[in-house]
Structures are given as C-alpha cells and as structure tokens.
Curated annotation (Swiss-Prot):
This protein's name: Ion-translocating oxidoreductase complex subunit E
UniProt source species: Shewanella frigidimarina (strain NCIMB 400)
Principal location listed in the UniProt entry: membrane
Enzyme class: translocase
Bilayer topology annotation: Multi-pass membrane protein
C-alpha cells in the first residue's frame, strides 16, 4: 500500500477523527442538528485542516521545538479567523447558525493533533493530503449524524440549505415525511450522543466482520532441538 493510500485509509476509516479518535466532540454533537449546519462546520474545519498542515509543514524546520505548540496555535487561529470572515461575508445566516462553534475550531484537537503528530514530521504534499483526508473523514461523520438527526427530528433532509448555498438552494429541501411536532430527543444534544454511539457501534461491527473474513495465518511452532556433545 502506497503512502497516500495509507493516509486516505487512516483519515477516512481506520483512524477517523470522529469515530476512532473521538476528537472535536463538542461541535460535532452541538451543531449537527441539520445537514446544513454539519456541512458548513465540516467544510470550515476541512479548510483549516488543510491550511494548517501545509503551513506547519513549511515552517517545521524553522520553529524551535520548545515553542512549536504556541506557533501552531497561532497559525490555526489565523486560518480560523480567515474562514470565519469568509463565512460571515458570503453565508451570514450560516455564520449566525454556527455561532460560537465556528471560532472554537481553534481549540479543535483534531487540527492541533494533526499539526503536531503528522505535519511537523512529514513533507508538504503528504501533510496537505493528510489534512484533506482527515477533514473529509470528520466532515463525513458530521454529515451522517446531521442527516440522521434531521430526518428523525424534522422529517426532512437538506432543510435550510439556502443558509449555505444561497436562496436558490431552498429547492433542495426534501420532505421525507410530515412531522407535526419535532422529535426533540433527536434534535437536542442527548440525541446526538445516542446517534454518535450508534455510529461508533456500527463501525466496530463492520470492522469485526471484515477482520473475521480475513484469512487466518496459522503460526507454526518450531521445537528447538537440543544437541548434546558426545565425547
């Protein structure tokens, strides 16, 4: 398996930031009431991940080890500020919907963790690809959780898509079934915890079945012969 294939497998499945590392749970559980919010936060995190990995990889040889963490945090904070200003300018309603969780991307352990564990020790290309794959893996978890909560809670999919894509995107809303009263358990944080637990359980079941299908390698025991010298 090539280096890029291994990075992709780690980010999307084997070491997924949300399902395996369980990082960034605060925004993951709080913002994923709809697909729109989940996708907006996921794309913002993805952009910051790629940018921080690239910049950290570029400056890794010039930053003393003693101050590397503060420097990494400053880089991440600058990128989050840029993304925040962009969303504020071009998707103001989404900016209001995400609220405090948008600037809190600075404290997301996924980003600082990849900067320290990977980007500071690998090449520019590998670091950028790692940021892309980790960001996509995190965004996928956000979107799946947001879709399930929106579907169970409101009976819709892509509700409020115009907040992210503009007024024309209001036609993207899909009404799967009619709901007179929203299912509050799915819409509130307790429902997010339950949904997250079910997603983790599903991943573990899939992994266990895949491992069970793998051919078993039988270990051959070797008995060491004792040689006694005869005079």
């Amino acid at each position: 398996m090539s280096k890029y294939s291994e990075i992709a497998a780690q980010g999307l499945w084997k070491n997924n930031p949300g399902l395996v590392q369980l990082l960034g749970l605060c925004p993951l559980l709080a913002v994923t009431a709809t697909i729109t919010n989940a996708l907006g936060l996921g794309v913002a995190t993805l952009l910051v991940l790629i940018g921080s990995n690239v910049l950290v990889s570029l400056v890794r040889d010039f930053v003393p080890k003693e101050i590397r963490i503060p420097v990494f945090v400053m880089i991440i904070a600058a990128l989050v500020t840029c993304v925040q200003l962009l969303i504020n300018a071009y998707a103001y309603n989404l900016y209001l919907s995400l609220g405090i969780f948008l600037p809190l991307i600075v404290t997301n352990c996924v980003i600082i963790g990849r900067a320290e564990a990977f980007a500071s020790r690998n090449s520019l290309a590998h670091s950028a690809f790692d940021g892309l794959m980790m960001g996509l893996g995190f965004t996928a978890v956000l979107v799946v959780l947001g879709a399930s909560r929106e579907l169970l809670g409101q009976g819709t999919l892509f509700g409020g898509a115009d907040l992210l894509l503009g007024d024309w995107a209001s036609v993207l809303t899909i009404h799967v079934w009619h709901v007179d009263t929203p299912f509050l358990l799915a819409m509130l944080p307790p429902g997010a915890f339950i949904g997250m637990g079910l997603l983790i359980a599903l991943k573990n079941v899939i992994d266990s079945r895949v491992n069970a299908m793998q051919p078993k390698v039988e270990s051959v025991s070797v008995t060491r012969a004792r040689i006694t010298k005869v005079n």
